[in-house]
């Protein structure tokens, strides 16, 4: 039980008829979960308005409603200007502000967030004696314990609950992916980030943000909520993003020019990347077992973060040399005895697909075969762009399905094929993704690199609101076993 007054601490209350010293059993923002004595927060969302469910919450026994529009039935209410932001404030109060007990690290950007979180976690655990909580796309982790995740950044109340669990488990640091949606929808409102990291910006989520400028401005919000703002100086959106940053300290990293942390003498090899890192008077050689140029950027932002938290560059490099990569991020799926390589990557955006194919071309001794589709019910404008990238960078393209969701796979594929026009690159269309993978393997030659793009860590395919099992690691292994009998 908490007093209503305690839960509302820090809110600008516009109007109320509620007894502020009344007891509240629990906080709910889903009316279906409300029980007698609860505080129901009517959140205004993009798809639905929580105010519509106030009558249901009242029927279930809600003691008070936190809202933007006062209910007409005279029920106890507290009115605020922004109920979504209020949800974050109440969540912090409900769980006693766990973020204040740990060193918070937030990473935003179109690509690279997931890999960077794992690299930072690895360095801090090996070299700073830290117990690190991780929040991200693949999974959430409390130390070594894995928790299920449904979205990149949880809703604010659930985030506060998770952070409390991490703090109580002894976590000293938390590294989390912070999506543009999370920043715009106040899911991380009030979180005191010690370090904020910006990786890059490329075309994505324009169905939500509408323009690249708005997308950039959403990402920029993190730089007004952190003590140290670390950014990729090579990214063309960095200047705009940092223009209104209020972080007391700024720290840049670069592969191509001058910055606070620089990578030099980059060498990309099959299965790894090597380079020299320099910051101030420190220098070290870095070896990472993730074969891609963008790995250098992910490694730099991880090193920049940990260096700003007191870990020397050489210690960062030593920890990174022991890192074996991240599931579904430039992951090499074993194909012994074939002579070809299968790469699995989550590249489901134009920029990510381009970077993966460029990296594959850098070490492929034969052809680069690109197998990909595009997600249904998502930004349709990127589909022909993905097709163009595949045709321009790959030697052979297999257009297939990703997560069709409620769209017809053939319609999505038709959108992708528009981008292949004007190129002589040979291609084929195989809507069934499993059959497409089999085809790629059956026609591969020694030295080829098959890039399975789009699914990455996912072990399912989403069709008509249902998830069907589909793990590309399993598909490759089983087909290899079948064909080598």
Residue ranges and their predicted role:
Residues 1-14, 36-39, 125, 249, ...:
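ATP-dependent carboxylate-amine ligase
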Residues 1-89, 259-267, 291, 311-314, ...:
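N-terminal leader/targeting and accessory segments in enzymes
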Residues 6, 10, 67-75, 193-342, ...:
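Acidic, Mg2+-coordinating active-site environments of NTP-dependent enzymes
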Residues 8-11, 87-233, 237-248, 279, ...:
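Phosphate-binding loop of NTP-binding sites
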Residues 24, 37, 62, 74-75, ...:
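Short, well-ordered alpha-helix to beta-strand connector turns
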Residues 45-47, 180-181, 202-204, 235-236, ...:
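Short glycine-rich anion-binding loops that position phosphate/pyrophosphate groups of nucleotides
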Residues 63-69, 229-233, 371-372, 395-403:
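Short internal beta-strands
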Residues 74-83, 147-150, 247-251:
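Active-site regions of enzymes building and remodeling cell-envelope glycoconjugates
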